């Protein structure tokens, strides 16, 4: 899997959402290898779009389409200031349910201190989380060459996610979560309360 993360400050979040709807209607049918996307904006206008493709080549073919170029030229005017792009083929997916059914998405960004250990912890915690956090539908994590990462956690609802955060975690799970926090140094959270989810 290949992931492209696009981030920036929105002048008009609703206009960005409309542009995504236009892409879904008019451009998605011709996007061969497209697997879906997640997007949205925080209450302060920080926006993120995360597109998933089968491969970097599929993403590049989509990017090379003239209609894609025109669409992006129209879309970027709704951002304020520079837009950041981050690409990765180092992607880890954890799914306990249908991610596209999420009503709340929390984005975590930061630096990973030990990539291999992070992968092991995620695999080990998967069955535990599926039991102790039924509100968590799953997560998608993209690791980048500069040791940065972007993780998207998909929840049934914000209310359920907050309740899950307050719930006491069993000993083994608590130990793993503490180690995860040491390995995955989160520096930024984005709470997407109205996620834009596009199915392929």
What are these regions (language model features)?
Residues 1-50, 54-200:
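Short S/T/G/P-rich N-terminal loop/turn motif that feeds into the first structured element of a domain
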């Amino acid at each position: 899997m290949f992931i492209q993360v696009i981030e920036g400050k929105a002048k008009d979040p609703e206009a960005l959402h409309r542009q995504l709807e236009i892409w879904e209607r008019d451009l998605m049918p011709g996007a061969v290898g497209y697997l879906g996307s997640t997007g949205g904006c925080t209450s302060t206008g920080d926006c993120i779009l995360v597109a998933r493709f089968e491969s970097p080549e599929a993403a590049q073919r989509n990017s090379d389409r003239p209609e894609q170029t025109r669409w992006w030229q129209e879309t970027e005017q709704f951002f304020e200031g520079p837009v950041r792009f981050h690409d990765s083929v180092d992607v880890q997916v954890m799914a306990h349910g249908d991610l596209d059914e999420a009503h709340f998405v929390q984005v975590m960004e930061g630096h990973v201190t030990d990539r291999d250990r992070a992968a092991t912890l995620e695999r080990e915690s998967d069955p535990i989380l599926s039991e102790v956090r039924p509100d968590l539908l799953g997560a998608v994590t993209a690791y980048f060459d500069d040791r940065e990462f972007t993780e998207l956690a998909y929840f049934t609802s914000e209310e359920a996610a907050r309740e899950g955060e307050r719930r006491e975690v069993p000993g083994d799970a608590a130990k793993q979560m503490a180690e995860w926090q040491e390995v995955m140094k989160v520096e930024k959270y984005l709470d997407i309360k109205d996620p834009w989810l596009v199915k392929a």
